Amino acid sequence: MVKSAFPAMSAAELAGIEEEYTDLQAELERRCDAMSDRLEYPDWYAIEKETAFLYYAVCRHTKPATVLETGVANGHSSFFFLQAMKKNGKGSLHSVDIADNVGKILTDDERHDWTLHVLEAPQRRSFRKVMDSISPIDIFVHDSDHTYGWQMFEYKTARQAMSQKGVLLSDDVDHNLSFVDFCTELDRKPILLLDTRKVSGMLLPKV
């Protein structure tokens, strides 16, 4: 899927990314085992492995300056974005959540390149304020409130703040039709990934 989405990616680049990801997945599992009694969120909140690889590969290949994700939980997706940007030698991760007890698996060193924005009421106004403060965004990831109205709001607001090369990613697009409807409104064809339990979506920049 990654190679077909990014035809300019060489076989050697993809193989290198796969090797990096395998090592990082093992490190993440070790951390989770060691911290199992201190993590705030259950395992099923975590990003699934194929989706995690997609996110890591997109970040490694596109080398974004700014990534924004919504929904953090224990910090699995945050971990992969931060590790990808460390390899890239550039980039900052901004995460949006409604709670501050998130990202527990991240080390102090990883938190240096990570900014957590806790939404205040009214949440839509607070979300727009975050977007305005960090745009343009090169990668946007939705993984927060999986209701049609909120997802559509996030997608549309994020699109307005994205750079010309921006990639939009979304977890749990099988919860409702918001992602498909959003892409249809733009007359664009999304890329879908069926993982173990759910479906993730990706919308690439228009060529």
Name each region found by the language model.
Residues 1-141, 145-207:
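A short alpha-helical cap/connector motif
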